[in-house]
Curated annotation (Swiss-Prot):
GO terms for biological process: tRNA modification. This is tRNA uridine(34) hydroxylase. The gene is trhO. The keyword tRNA processing applies. It comes from the Bacteria. GO terms for molecular function: oxidoreductase activity, acting on paired donors, with incorporation or reduction of molecular oxygen. The active site is at C183 (cysteine persulfide intermediate). InterPro entries: Rhodanese-like_dom (IPR001763), Rhodanese-like_dom_sf (IPR036873), TrhO (IPR020936), TRHO_N (IPR040503). Keywords: Oxidoreductase, tRNA processing. SUPFAM superfamilies: Rhodanese/Cell cycle control phosphatase. It is an enzyme of class 1 (oxidoreductase). The keyword tRNA processing applies.
Amino acid sequence: MQEILNIAAYKFVAIDDSPVLREDLRERAQALGLMGTILLAPEGINLFLAGLPDAVRSFVAGLRADVRFADLETKESWSAAQPFRRMLVKLKREIIRMDHPAIQPAAGRAPGVDAPTLKRWLDQGHDDEGREIALLDTRNDFEVDEGSFDGAIDWRITKFTEFPPALKAHRADFAGKTVVSFCTGGIRCEKAAILMREEGIENVLQLEGGILKYFEEVGGAHYHGDCFVFDGRRALAPDLSARAADASARAAEDVGLSSGLKK
């Protein structure tokens, strides 16, 4: 029986009270018996939490009571057991490290494409303007190895800070194409899409909600394998079930993705 509700969410929004907010969120999460990781930075919030459904939803409702997070969108999945080992709330320079301070998603984001539209484009082999689709995987190499979109571009980066120089080396590859950046839940592809537009690449979109939202809305069409996740479930299938529910992969201790977690 799938009793544990897992949520992933992020929002780029200015936060100037991180130390106080950290204690508040930690106390509330612990009181509700939740486990997982919350990252706070001046640029926003990034969280992965799991617990009993009522407890998770109570926490999210409390978070949305803060005007900064009123429109926070969550992605849900279920598991038979708690995939995290403890509850962590961390303060970071960035909620997803890129080491590119000029990229400020809270000040404006690149346009997005939703899952049904992307599936339709992939079905027909081009976007609505007739341009070829270039799917760009912005995740780390070991995540890509678990599964990705068919024909997606994979630069074999080992951490997200390698994305900017990789982009400079390959920017000419995107001429005349519609580029769709994607990642697990949307956070990395949001920064990646902004950087590509600032580098002068035209027709750049980000996959809204990432792979997990795509799975939720259209399943595994044009996708092979599973989606790596940074918790004890290891990976999620296109039906959002855990492929390795009993795997011994460690629970996420730093979803900043800079720890070099290996399979």
